[in-house]
Amino acid sequence: AETQAILNYNMRHPRFCRPSGWGATPAFTRRFNNPYREWIGAAIRADFWGYAAAGNPELAAEFAYRDACWTHTKNGIYAEMFVAAVISAAFCESDPEKLIRIGLSEIPANCRFAEAVRLSLQWKKEAPTWEQFMDKLDERYKNMHCVHAINNLQIVVMALLYGNSTIDRNCALAVMGGMDTDCTAATIGSITGILNPESHLAERLNDTIEPNFIGESVCSMKALAERTLAVHRKIRECAK
């Protein structure tokens, strides 16, 4: 979805000689030749907005919407808004179901994504184990693509509801749930890391990151955390 949206943007960028009204707009970039627009790509960009607007789920969801609307539509957007709100709320709330309901409060109640999350809360009451939960999910969404936002974020919700708030367990549940495992495990790991800040995870990891971003050849998790905290403080100051 992101690649196609960027291609769409470049195709209509005003640096080219184009007719009046030909500009690159979100309505065009997210839709034109983009069948991936309700997949999980926007949701996995949500983390930073939750960190930057820590403790303010409404603002986190707003940032997420602004980000997602260029590349995704409908449930692809709502998934990012939901995740950003949950991450933001996790700095102030630890109860999994309350976090999920906070996330739901930031998206349209009648969208398919919200319906799926509410269904997940119901399945938790009916299914004693995560395996039984997954049986219900697989049956309900057996014809949905394995990279769609709806079914994958239900796995994140499952890991949050059935996990024990440790990164190892919650990430393992997300991976065992299948589908887009690198995305779901990263999202639940992000949420769980906030809920369990004393996990000492950094002690077991190499702090060096070598990203593929232009201008960022080598960085560290510590440096990224410090930069993120600086953004949060700036946003908090501006919001006063």
Identify the residue ranges that each predicted region occupies.
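Structured, active/binding-site neighborhoods that engage oxygen-rich ligands
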Residues: 1-240
